[in-house]
Amino acid sequence: MSDCIYNIRKRSDMTSATQNKKYKVEAYTDTVKYYYEYLVELSKNKYKSILPYIQYILINAIKYRVGEEIPENISPTIKKDYQNRIINIIKQIDDDVIINTNKVVLDTKLYLLKLKYDELPKDDLEFKDGFAYFKNKKIDKIINKNSFSITNMSLKREKLWINGLIKMSSYFEFNHLYVDEVGKTYKINLLETDKNRKSFLNDDMNIIKSFSGFITLDRKKTRLMFYTKYNELDIIFKPNINIDKHNKMKKRCGILKNKIYSVKNNRTLLIEHFLLLRFVIKYLREVQMYFKKN
């Protein structure tokens, strides 16, 4: 049921296309009334409750709506009524349905639970072993492949400069990136960005922060581990190298100026900084060209 599929009417012309619906008043009035609320009442009248299958249909539709800002052409009255109706439906959805619906990231699940309970009950929320739990039920991984990305790296006089982004649920408060390098820990400040994902209530569903800093490399070969802290919890990131979008080997190994980097165990970044021999450079370039052509 968490992967439910349902049919949608064939659209008669481009004026009713999906990409235009967010600017139409009907999307915030008729759709909610004659689709979402209709299903709720139909199920209650026939079965005295909202069937799990109906709940999955509703949550699969609503999950997109809570993560979209309402356009300015919608009047404040309609906007407020729409928000209240959506929240009222969410309050009738079972926790298990919100938690177990597939293809919904942790940010959205936590936000849906927050809307249901007005505020997330901290006593019921737990983080351990890299997962988030609500009332002892596993929700999802705390981080995913898009949570941490390195957008630029450069080596200057034994200093490795690193730039990147951290993307996490707005539930977490995090202000620093920590980099562990054999016996040393570096603390890099995180900066606010204007890339946060806004909800239909115009608050933040997730927070994206940028970082820029350097670490001093005293060895020819070292390992780096990246993490941030939330209260007493260490949130360890899996390096996502995003230097060259055309390089299909970027997640496993690559070449940047005068160093080799590679990801080991999905958690640590192995740095070898030395001048490469000409044949090694030539070989790696040939491999890169092969992947680009194919």
PLM features per residue range, with description:
Residues K33-S49:
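Short amphipathic alpha-helical segments and their helix-coil junctions
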Residues N45-N294:
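Non-catalytic N-terminal targeting/anchoring module and adjacent flexible stem/linker
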